């Protein structure tokens, strides 16, 4: 009986950890760097994972993608106020947008480039960062990644 309970608990924990079952996929036609994975462990137990991969689209747009899943991202809520930092902050700006039907925040910093943060699930956040991409290029790249991540999730 104890084994059945333990097995049921393990299956439930595995299913919960695979809520989005995401990884940063290899995209056909893109140059995809190696997937770097960091498990987020603490004294209190496993807290999630951090995945990183560099991409270059077929059009030559280079960006870094980061997928964080676990205890940290579930506390993240998109800000309700957006705007521009003005001259004193170096011209940074932030804007709420929608990417593939998900709430997102697009941040622009003149020296660092663009950062697009998309909340895909209760426990998962996808971030794309690029020094050279424009808004449309980064948004299209995010949409492509999200579509592929969701397709892989549906296959499982």
Spans of features found by a protein language model:
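A short, solvent-exposed beta-edge/loop patch
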Residues: 81-156
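Short, surface-exposed beta-edge/turn micro-motifs
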Residues: 12, 61-63, 123
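General helical structural elements
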Residues: 7-8, 57
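Bacterial N-terminal signal peptides
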Residues: 8-15
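Short, solvent-exposed recognition patches
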Residues: 22-109
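Sec/Tat signal peptide C-region and signal peptidase I cleavage site
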Residues: 16-21
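Bacterial N-terminal signal peptides that target proteins for export
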Residues: 1-7
């Amino acid at each position: 009986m104890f084994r059945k309970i333990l097995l049921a608990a393990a299956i439930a924990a595995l299913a919960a950890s695979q809520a989005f079952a995401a990884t940063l996929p290899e995209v056909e036609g893109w140059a995809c760097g190696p997937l770097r994975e960091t498990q987020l462990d603490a004294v209190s137990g496993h807290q999630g994972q951090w995945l990183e991969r560099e991409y270059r689209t077929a059009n030559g747009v280079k960006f870094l993608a980061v997928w964080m899943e676990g205890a940290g991202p579930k506390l993240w809520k998109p800000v309700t106020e957006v705007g521009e930092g003005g001259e004193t902050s170096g011209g940074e700006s932030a804007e709420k947008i929608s990417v593939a039907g998900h709430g997102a925040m697009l941040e622009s910093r003149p020296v660092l480039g663009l950062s697009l943060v998309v909340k895909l699930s209760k426990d998962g956040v996808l971030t794309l960062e690029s020094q050279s991409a424009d808004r449309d290029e980064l948004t299209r790249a995010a949409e492509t990644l999200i579509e592929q991540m969701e397709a892989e999730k549906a296959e499982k």
